[in-house]
């Protein structure tokens, strides 16, 4: 089945678990993956991996499968991911609690998010981004896909994202890139205290492929 067909099937099976208007285009996926440095050591965490268009782009970018953790809320999409990317750790779970799926003491190179953050309250958006950045080194980044024309959190919070517009997608999309070095020290400390970092590695799991 095509990527769009898989997207529609997931939408019909679990309408409450799918928030994206359409699957990402290859051009958008490549632009997102280009924000991740494959030479930066550590895990790359993809939140809201969907049908795997961005997952494939990250692999094409040079991210080794064993370095990639894909978190997806929709059970059908998570099954597709497990089937298509056997070397990638696929987790069916909550992107806002992604830390619990990480091995204790893991180094994070980047977090890539396709979760529609503008659909969630501002405090949840801010907490997710600041926690994700706090878990990374100074070169870490949080890359957010959005179909809105405003960033998920404003520069008033002391974090000014870089903006990229991708026109070769329907609808046109924004990529907001937040870097760890921009985050105020006080926010980093608070995020580390509340992140739940260091959960057991057993929380990682691969799920079974979907049945037709």
Predicted regions and their residues:
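Class I SAM-dependent methyltransferase Rossmann-like catalytic core
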Residues: 3-38
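SAM/dcSAM-binding transferase cores
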Residues: 7-10, 155-212
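Conserved class I S-adenosyl-L-methionine
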Residues: 41-50
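Glycine-rich SAM-binding Motif I of class I
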Residues: 52-56
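Conserved SAM/SAH-binding beta-strand->alpha-helix loop
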Residues: 74
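Conserved SAM-binding loop
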Residues: 81-82
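A short glycine-rich, Lys/Arg-flanked "PGG" loop and its adjoining helix->strand segment in the class I
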Residues: 126-138
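Conserved beta-strand signature within the Rossmann-like core of class I S-adenosyl-L-methionine
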Residues: 136-147
């Amino acid at each position: 089945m095509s990527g769009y067909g898989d997207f529609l099937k997931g939408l019909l099976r679990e309408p409450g678990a799918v928030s994206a208007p359409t699957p990402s285009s290859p051009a958008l996926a490549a632009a997102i993956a280009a924000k991740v440095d494959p030479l930066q050591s550590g895990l790359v965490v993809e939140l809201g991996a969907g049908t795997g268009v961005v997952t494939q782009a990250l692999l094409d970018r040079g991210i080794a499968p064993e370095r990639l953790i894909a978190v997806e809320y929709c059970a059908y999409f998570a099954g597709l991911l497990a089937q298509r990317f056997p070397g990638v750790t696929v987790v069916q779970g909550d992107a806002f609690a992604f830390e619990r799926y990480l091995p204790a003491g893991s180094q994070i190179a980047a977090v890539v998010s396709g979760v529609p953050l503008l659909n969630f309250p501002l405090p949840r958006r801010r907490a997710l981004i600041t926690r994700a950045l706090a878990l990374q080194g100074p070169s870490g980044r949080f890359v957010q896909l959005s179909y809105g024309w405003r960033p998920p959190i404003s520069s008033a919070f002391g974090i000014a994202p870089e903006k990229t517009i991708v026109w070769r997608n329907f609808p046109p999309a924004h990529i907001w890139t937040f870097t760890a070095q921009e985050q105020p020290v006080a926010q980093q400390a608070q995020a580390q205290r509340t992140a739940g970092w260091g959960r057991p590695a057993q929380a990682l799991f691969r799920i079974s492929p979907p049945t037709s």
